[in-house]
Swiss-Prot record:
The keyword Ribosomal protein belongs to this UniProt entry's keyword annotation: no
GO cellular component terms given for this protein: plasma membrane
Protein name: UPF0761 membrane protein LPC_2650
Keyword Cell membrane: yes
Keywords noted in UniProt: Cell inner membrane, Cell membrane, Membrane, Transmembrane, Transmembrane helix
Family, as annotated: Belongs to the UPF0761 family.
Cited HAMAP family: UPF0761 (MF_00672)
Regions that span the bilayer: 36-56, 99-119, 137-157, 177-197, 210-230, 241-261
Membrane topology: Multi-pass membrane protein
Amino acid sequence: MNWKEKVKTKFYSCDRFVRFVIQHFIQDDCTYIASALAFTSLLAVVPLMSVGLAIFSSFPVFQGLAEPVQNFIFDNFVPATGKIVQSYLQQFTSQVSKLSIWGVVFLIFTALLVMFTIERAMNKIWRVSSSRHGVSAFLLYWAIISLAPVLLGLSLAASSYLFSMPILADHRAPYTILHYSPFFLSLIGFTFLYVVVPNCPVKIRHAFWGGLVAAILFESAKHAFAYYLIRYNTYELLYGAFATVPIFFIWVYWVWIITLLGAEISYAFSVHHQRRGGKSLDGFSHALLWLHQLWIAQQHGKGLSFNDLVDASKQPFAVDVDEMINALIYHELIHATADGHYMLSRDLSHVTLYDLTQLLPYRLPTHLELQYSKASLSEQWRAAFKRHNEELKKSLDINLEELFKKTGTILK
């Protein structure tokens, strides 16, 4: 393959990737989910700040850093209107100490509700049917809410210590680090979100690429939004003193659009098999191929991971891989192990090809599909399917008019 063909192949691969991301972004209703998350976030921003500041202030080492942390967040992550929003939120959070025990419980519940909504959105993108429940969900949500301010405080404390060192104080390095720190914190935050929140394994490198795109878009959106507010602030003309509320809501909405787009990119990297080119492998051949690979693995006393099954064929799959796994599990042909691998659940010496046709909701491959599956199916399989198609053709070689004449009149 010469360099022109390589460039052409890469171009088509990138084109399929972009189309895949856009298609799934639309299919998953990400714009609608972003609006729901923006509304929920506005309701929970005061509870989240209150819980975060309470945890932050409980550590003596962070005494005196609460205000710098707030200033850093609103200066670097909320464009233009950050100071106004910050002053309002500080007024609201100052009233938290006057709440009753039930008021505090409601604040914590609202903060956890945001995390639950975020997890549902991520699970929808990653095609996960069930969310976390009970103690595991509470521990994860609470860990994220409680660790975020602590980690941010540690990073600021470490930065302050480094900047005060004589060896760095006279150099430009601290200012360069400070200038780019919002971008790197955004990158870490997005990557962490894509790895931890979905209720399924996500590789760090896949989450990183989604986080990188999201962080770049986030920084670009900050500057674009600030430029718009300075030059073309129509909301201030319309709403006057109340303009801060719709402006802040629109900004939060765009942040969630960017976050969900980054999640779709991470998901696209995770399911590379769905972006393959060429003719698709039919559902029945797909199932048979997986059972064959699991049977081989069983001979060596081991199971196969999801990626092992996906890589069994280089063709794209006509049936969604998650749907295929659920179908095989439902009919008790395979099961998932504790370590996330898959193994056979039946003795295949007692399962015939006919049994498989009756169990699975997929028809046998047609003559045309067999021609496109030479790379994935053995000659023995293709010969068996061909004999079946020929025998089926002989059995059903009767035209519909003749069939209907023999049936007689049913409707009166």
